[in-house]
Amino acid sequence: MNKQSINIAQIRREYTHKRLRRADLTLEPMELFERWFRQASTAQLLDLTVVSVATVDQTGQPYQRLVLLKHFDAKGMVFYTNLGSRKAQHLAHNARISLHFPWHALERQVMVLGTAKQLALKEVMHYFSSRPRNSQISAWASSQSSLIDTRDTLVSTFLKFNNYFHQGKVPLPSFWGGYRVHIDSMEFWQGGAYRLHDRFIYQRIASGWRIDRLAP
């Protein structure tokens, strides 16, 4: 190793931004998520909607990737993808999924566990029609997760579809869609001094939500 390599064991800082107390909690987890989301938006966090999505393949091997959250409400959280992608293939045989929001600037993170269900065509078409035209073209151009020789291959395919759809609206590809994550549990983490972080977990039960504090 280079003598001037970074000593990562000594990289640390104290988390002193805020506390999370039981009195701060809401009855429903999505209400607290919306509050934190608005606070993150007010703080102008970069890439606010970026979320890490974890799935597993048929051998149990986990995979993660970053996607963009496109909607959330009491019914769950929504993201869109190529239905031939690795994540979509995983969800086809195991719909269990985990989402992670890393809002480092606010010393916060949110972890979601749930089940992903494919969106109805009408909802997908409504969102696809709102995308910028180049994003619509890229949905056609990329066979997500497949092997390609060079970036030039991808660009060439993009230009081909850009020319093909040069007039009128870009249609929705049959292989493109979205998922709604129906939430079973949601954990809220607020960094604390001396590593005494605040963690609360909401878990769905028959009568609503059970809320517990977790040790850091």
From Swiss-Prot:
Cofactor: FMN
Annotated FMN binding sites: 65-70, 80-81, 86-87, 109, 144-145, 189, 199
Residues reported in the UniProt entry to bind substrate: 12-15, 70, 127, 131, 135, 195-197
PROSITE patterns xrefs: PYRIDOX_OXIDASE
Keyword Flavoprotein: yes
EC number: 1.4.3.5
Signal peptide region: none
Role played: Catalyzes the oxidation of either pyridoxine 5'-phosphate (PNP) or pyridoxamine 5'-phosphate (PMP) into pyridoxal 5'-phosphate (PLP).
Protein's name according to its UniProt entry: Pyridoxine/pyridoxamine 5'-phosphate oxidase
Lineage: Bacteria, Pseudomonadati, Pseudomonadota, Gammaproteobacteria, Candidatus Palibaumannia
Gene: pdxH
